Structure formats: structure tokens, C-alpha cells
Regions:
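Extracytoplasmic/periplasmic sensory segments of membrane signal-transduction proteins
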Residues: 21-120
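Cytosolic-side ends of inner-membrane transmembrane helices, especially those
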Residues: 258-273
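Short, hydrophobic beta-strand elements of compact beta-sandwich sensory domains
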Residues: 147-164, 213-256
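Short hydrophobic alpha-helical segments used for membrane anchoring or interfacial signaling
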Residues: 90-97, 179-190
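Conserved beta-strands of PAS-like sensory domains
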Residues: 102-104, 109-120, 138-173, 191, ...
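Membrane-proximal, non-catalytic sensory/regulatory domains of signal-transducing membrane proteins
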Residues: 121-150, 178-181, 186-187, 196-232
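Extreme N-terminal signal-anchor transmembrane helix of membrane signaling/transducer proteins, especially
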Residues: 1-17, 21, 256, 260
Length: 274
């Protein structure tokens, strides 16, 4: 009986450790994808930042200079996007006069470009109030992950559409309740990676590696140093117990049979003694 009890407890602990290890591995895969996106954005922004002369001509040059510089800058941006499959498009806006300078945006409408440019200007206004330089969020009719670089009077934004962001690994592969959240440095959820569940979107979450809600929910979080984003995997108690229930019933039956056999054996020994 004691051996069976020990086996039951150890099996549960091993299952829990296995699930946590699985979640941790999945979080690390998410993080590699995030880092890959932001590395691509960095490379693209660095390339465009080397064209400040062209941007200056667009902002302050003659009409002819502006046209020439815009064409050359667009060529450079298009090369950056085409050569980098991680990015959907890149956009440059002049923050001083709030003009959209150029956009390498295959398959993106003019209205979306304008919405993104407006978003950049709003971010610059927020930065004056002490906000950080790098941003990532959802905007417009489609969701985007954005990384933005600002010169003195211009801004570059490299974007990745949500439907290509973390699309190949989602929590739908964990149908028994596991969920993954993407949060910013303030703990605000910017994407729920469990398909069809939006209960956490936009909410501020306490993310820490500890037991929550009377040991009913485990939250494991990992931060990307490059992107400043947190990936958090959550495991509910049902996630453990659902897989464990079949084994538990089987072990319980074995324990009952073992106890019954012991009782019969003790009864037989008692009769033999007397």
C-alpha cells in the first residue's frame, strides 16, 4: 500500500515537472521567434538610418530634390523588405510636419499606411512624457508588431503582421487548457496566443514564476532582452488532473485490490492461528 501511495505521488510530481518542462521549452521557442523578428527590424532600421541625407532632402529640399530622394529611398526600403522575409513592410514618417515620406508596403492599403503614420506620431508625443523608445502593439484593422527608430525629425517603423507573427506555434496545439500570453514590460497583455480566448487582452497581469489562485494555476514567464516582451505560459490544475485522472483511477483500483488481498490474507492467518 505504501509503495502504491508513493508511486501515485511520484507519478503526479513527475507529470507536473514534465508539463512545466514542456511549457518552458515552448516559451523558449516563442522567444526565438520574437528575437528573430526584432533582429530583422533592427537590421532594416540600421540600413535606412544610413540614408539620412535622402530623408533630409525629402523633408527640407526643393520639390525636385524631394522627388528624387523619395524615389531613391523607396528603392532602398523595398530592397530591405524583399531581402528580409521576417518583415511585412517598413514606413518612414516626418514627425515635424506629420508627413508620410515613404513606405515599402506590399499588399498594404494607403489607409493602413496613414493609420500607421498616425500611430508613429502619437508614439512620439507619448515619448515626450517619458515613454520608452521602442514600441510594439496592435493598431488599425490588422494587428502589427512594430519597432520604431527616431531621428531628429523623422521616424522609421519596421512592422510584422500578427498573422505571420508566432503563427506556426500557438496554444491551439494544447487543447486541454494551456494558454500563452504575450505582454509588454508593464505586464499589459498585447496578444493572447490561445486562439479564440480574449479574456486577458489589454489587462494588466501580475506575471511571476509562482503558484497562483490557491495552487490552481501555474504561470511561467520569460523575457526577451531584445524585444522587451514577456512570454508567459499558464498551466491550470485541470491540465494536470485531466491527464492524470485515468492513471489515478487505475492506481486507486490496484490499491483497493491490494488492501482486499491483505485483509483476506490476514483473515486466513488469523484463522490458522486459532
Amino acid at each position: 500500500i505504501w509503495l502504491l501511495t508513493a508511486y501515485t505521488v511520484s507519478s503526479f510530481l513527475l507529470l507536473k515537472e514534465s508539463e512545466e518542462s514542456s511549457v518552458w521549452s515552448t516559451i523558449q521557442i516563442y522567444m526565438k521567434q520574437i528575437d528573430s523578428k526584432f533582429i530583422a527590424m533592427d537590421q532594416c532600421v540600421e540600413g535606412i538610418a544610413g540614408n539620412q541625407d535622402l530623408i533630409g532632402q525629402i523633408c527640407y529640399g526643393s520639390p525636385a530634390d524631394r522627388y528624387y530622394a523619395a524615389v531613391e529611398l523607396q528603392k532602398s526600403m523595398k530592397r530591405d523588405v524583399i531581402s528580409n522575409t521576417e518583415l511585412d513592410y517598413v514606413l518612414i514618417a516626418e514627425s515635424l510636419n506629420k508627413n508620410l515620406i515613404a513606405a515599402s508596403t506590399p499588399g498594404v492599403s494607403y489607409g493602413e499606411k496613414e493609420a500607421i503614420a498616425s500611430y508613429i506620431w502619437n508614439l512620439m508625443e507619448k515619448e515626450d512624457r517619458g515613454r520608452p523608445q521602442w514600441y510594439y502593439t496592435k493598431i488599425g484593422t490588422h494587428a502589427y508588431i512594430a519597432k520604431i527608430y527616431r531621428g531628429s525629425n523623422w521616424s522609421v517603423a519596421a512592422f510584422s503582421k500578427e498573422n505571420t507573427f508566432l503563427s506556426d506555434i500557438r496554444a491551439k496545439e494544447y487543447p486541454d487548457g494551456q494558454s500563452f500570453l504575450l505582454t509588454d514590460a508593464n505586464g499589459v497583455c498585447v496578444e493572447n496566443l490561445e486562439e479564440g480566448n480574449s479574456m486577458y487582452l489589454g489587462e494588466t497581469l501580475e506575471i511571476e514564476d509562482s503558484w497562483k489562485n490557491d495552487h490552481k494555476k501555474r504561470m511561467i514567464s520569460l523575457k526577451s532582452d531584445r524585444a522587451g516582451l514577456y512570454i508567459t505560459g499558464m498551466i491550470g490544475s485541470n491540465h494536470f488532473l485531466g491527464k492524470f485522472s485515468t492513471n489515478s483511477i487505475l492506481i486507486l483500483l490496484i490499491m483497493v485490490l491490494a488492501i482486499g488481498c491483505d485483509m483476506i490474507l490476514l483473515h486466513y492467518i488469523h484463522r490458522e492461528i486459532h
